[in-house]
Swiss-Prot record:
<feature type="transmembrane region" description="Helical">
    <location>
        <begin position="47"/>
        <end position="63"/>
    </location>
</feature>
<feature type="disulfide bond" description="Redox-active">
    <location>
        <begin position="38"/>
        <end position="41"/>
    </location>
</feature>
<keyword id="KW-0812">Transmembrane</keyword>
<keyword id="KW-0472">Membrane</keyword>
<feature type="transmembrane region" description="Helical">
    <location>
        <begin position="71"/>
        <end position="88"/>
    </location>
</feature>
<dbReference type="InterPro" id="IPR023380">
    <property type="entry name" value="DsbB-like_sf"/>
</dbReference>
<feature type="topological domain" description="Cytoplasmic">
    <location>
        <begin position="1"/>
        <end position="10"/>
    </location>
</feature>
<comment type="similarity">
    <text>Belongs to the DsbB family.</text>
</comment>
<feature type="topological domain" description="Cytoplasmic">
    <location>
        <begin position="165"/>
        <end position="171"/>
    </location>
</feature>
<keyword id="KW-0143">Chaperone</keyword>
<dbReference type="GO" id="GO:0006457">
    <property type="term" value="P:protein folding"/>
</dbReference>
<keyword id="KW-1003">Cell membrane</keyword>
<feature type="topological domain" description="Periplasmic">
    <location>
        <begin position="28"/>
        <end position="46"/>
    </location>
</feature>
<keyword id="KW-0813">Transport</keyword>
<comment type="function">
    <text>Required for disulfide bond formation in some periplasmic proteins. Acts by oxidizing the DsbA protein.</text>
</comment>
<keyword id="KW-0997">Cell inner membrane</keyword>
<keyword id="KW-0676">Redox-active center</keyword>
């Protein structure tokens, strides 16, 4: 059990979890089920990839200095907190009464071409009608609800990484 909780192993777990989640989204949800990701789903994936990237660098690079470990941890945690925040917003939009659901707007491609990045982020986080649609459920949970559970678990693993960084220095 002790070997499973090393700094390197925990970062590999985070990286593998991000790869598995992305493969599930792309292969199963998009290709097999034919579900296209809404802008909020895409934003969640971006945060997941950020977390996975920083975790891979931490696992492979295995830095010895606490400062570098903390920097990589901050990057990883920022990515997954972003994903969790966007997923929470997505769940909230899906639970709005029908008369309060934002109207459908242009897609993310249009926003990226026509607007500055700050406005793109504001528009996407405002949500749209397509983000309120629940197109698939598993165990009674929508995709954003499942994602929020996953992201919460990954936040907990990230906190274990922080614990490993700090506990090595205080021991």
């Amino acid at each position: 059990m002790q070997r499973l909780l090393t700094y390197r192993a925990l970062n590999f777990i985070l990286f593998i979890a991000s790869v598995v989640a992305m493969l599930f989204a792309i292969i199963f949800l998009q290709n097999y089920k034919g579900l296209e990701p809404c802008p909020l789903c895409i934003f969640q994936r971006i945060g997941l990839m950020v977390m996975g990237g920083f975790s891979l660098i931490a696992a492979v690079g295995h830095p010895k200095k606490m400062g570098m470990q903390l920097l990589l941890w901050i990057g990883s945690m920022a990515g997954i907190l972003w994903s969790a925040g966007v997923a929470a917003r997505h769940v909230w939009i899906q639970h709005l009464p029908a008369d309060q659901v934002p109207a459908c707007g242009p897609g993310l491609d249009y926003f990226l071409e026509a607007l500055p990045m700050k406005q793109v982020i504001n528009q996407v986080l405002s949500g749209s009608g397509e983000c309120a649609e629940i197109s698939w459920r598993f165990l009674g949970l929508s995709i954003p609800e499942q994602a929020l559970i996953l992201f919460t678990a990954l936040i907990l693993v990230n906190l274990l990484v922080l614990w490993r960084i700090i506990s090595k220095r205080t021991a």
